[in-house]
Structure formats: structure tokens, C-alpha cells
Design a protein with these regions (language model features):
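Membrane-proximal interfacial segments on either side of biological membranes
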Residues: 1-236, 241, 245-258
Length: 258
């Protein structure tokens, strides 16, 4: 099916598709897709996707409120599953989780059957705080290697409920992905835990009741937290937790969160 132009409009929001072809309910080809949407009367998306030798996505605004989940998303209904191409992304402003702002986000990469297999990107949180994301694909061993560094931690930890209440810190996340299984290491430096029920639960499991009370009150400072984790479909297992701070050292293993 070939459609020269298809427009959807609701109030100020609009979606315009040009030169689009469908095959088996999926997009097989397109020229341009223009997206402009509003949330609570404020513009939250304004960008254009162009498809030529490579797919280019450029815009002034992009809503990535579910950034962490988006990076790990596995969707059998991916509309771009027919595409294997180089990709270039350039957004002036991105809204990430917890209403943080990421500016001047640029990405070069490649998708295979609609999924990223290669990424090199950088964004600016302001005040000399940056986000770097890289992904490499090992075709021989059928593995992907994902690495994320961020000077701002909270927007990237929203997928993990036990990090609620974490303040400050710098984050380094590395993961080896093979099919539906990922083995990852998360390292956070120089942060504080304040009113964090999930972290309090972990401290209680380690028989550190007094420090758990402190984490609920004035807060608990850490120099380093390292977590080795394994995720298989919806099951998350924390294989090892090492936390070091001025008044605490914790080593745990085997905590499971589904």
C-alpha cells in the first residue's frame, strides 16, 4: 500500500506521513514523518524523521520520559522492523524522566530490523554535566555491549524502584546483552540516600537496622555503590551489592526483585 500523504490532527498536535508504504501492517518505506504534540498545553514533541540513504531524526523537542525503558525495549510490534540502516539523531532539547532537561543531544548509530545495534551519543544536562551512551554489536557471538555514563543519575534509575530517594552521584552502567538475558554492572559514586524505602529494605536484609533508620531520616552518604545484576525477561536478580561509605560497608548477594 502506497500513501502519498497522511495527516492526523487533534488540536495543535499533528502527525504527517509522506510517501509511506506499508507491508504486512509494518512500514516498508517512507520519505518523511513529521511529529508535533502537546502535553498539558505545552509542546513536548517537535521533530521530523527523514528516510534517504540513512534515517535522520532532527527536532527542537523530544519527550523521552521513559528513557531507561526505551533503551531496553523489546517490542515485537516494532513498525520499523523492515529497516536496516544508519541513523543520525539531533535534538535541541529532550525531556527525560523526573522532568530533567537534556540539551544538544546527538547520536549516530545503526538499526537492524528496527532495533539499535550500534550507538554513539552525547547530551548535555547543563552545569558541566553530560550523558554518554555507546552500544556495540558482536555479530560473531550474538552479543551487544551497552555502556552509559551520566553525571546526573536519577533520570536513568527510574526503572529500579529501590533507587527512589537517591540524591546526587555519577553513574556508570555497562551491560552485555544476549537475547533476553543481560548481565550488567552498575556503579554510582559520591551520592546520598534520603527517605528511600527500597534501599532501607536492602540495609535491613543486611541486618543494618540502625543505618536503615538513618537512611529514613537525615540520609546516608556513600562513596561507591557497585551492583552486579542479571535480568532474564521480567526477572531481575542482584547477584552482588557492594556499598562503601564513611559509616558503612555492605557486601550482599542474591537479592531478587521481580
Amino acid at each position: 500500500i502506497l500513501i502519498k500523504e497522511l495527516s492526523f490532527k487533534e488540536g495543535k498536535s499533528s502527525l504527517i506521513l509522506e510517501g509511506i508504504k506499508f507491508s504486512k501492517e509494518k512500514i516498508s518505506s517512507f520519505k518523511n514523518i513529521s511529529v508535533r504534540t502537546f502535553n498539558n498545553k505545552r509542546e513536548n514533541n517537535d521533530f521530523i524523521i527523514s528516510n534517504h540513504k540513512k534515517i535522520v531524526i532532527r527536532g527542537t523537542q523530544f519527550d523521552a520520559s521513559n528513557l531507561a525503558k526505551f533503551l531496553k525495549k523489546k517490542d515485537s510490534k516494532n513498525l520499523l522492523s523492515n529497516f536496516t540502516k544508519d541513523v543520525e539523531i539531533d535534538f535541541a532539547n529532550i525531556t527525560v524522566p523526573l522532568s530533567e532537561k537534556l540539551n544538544n543531544f546527538k547520536l549516530i548509530g545503526k538499526i537492524s530490523k528496527g532495533k539499535f545495534i550500534k550507538i554513539s551519543s552525547k547530551g548535555d544536562f547543563g552545569e558541566n554535566n553530560f550523558l554518554d551512551i555507546s552500544m556495540k554489536n558482536d555479530q560473531k557471538n550474538n552479543k551487544q555491549y551497552l555502556e552509559i555514563y551520566s553525571d546526573v543519575t536519577k533520570p536513568l534509575l527510574t526503572e529500579y524502584s529501590f533507587f527512589k530517594g537517591l540524591v546526587g552521584g555519577k553513574l556508570l552502567f555497562s551491560s552485555v546483552i544476549e537475547g533476553n538475558v543481560s548481565n550488567s554492572k552498575l556503579k554510582i559514586e559520591e551520592f546520598k540516600v534520603v527517605n528511600a524505602p527500597g534501599m532501607v529494605k536492602l540495609l535491613s536484609l543486611a541486618d543494618l537496622g540502625g543505618l536503615a533508620d538513618l537512611a529514613e531520616g537525615e540520609g546516608l552518604s556513600f562513596d561507591t555503590l557497585e551492583i552486579k545484576m542479571e535480568k532474564n525477561n521480567s526477572e531481575l536478580k542482584l547477584n552482588e551489592i557492594i556499598a562503601i561509605g564513611p559509616s558503612i560497608s555492605v557486601l550482599m548477594d542474591g537479592y531478587q526483585n521481580q
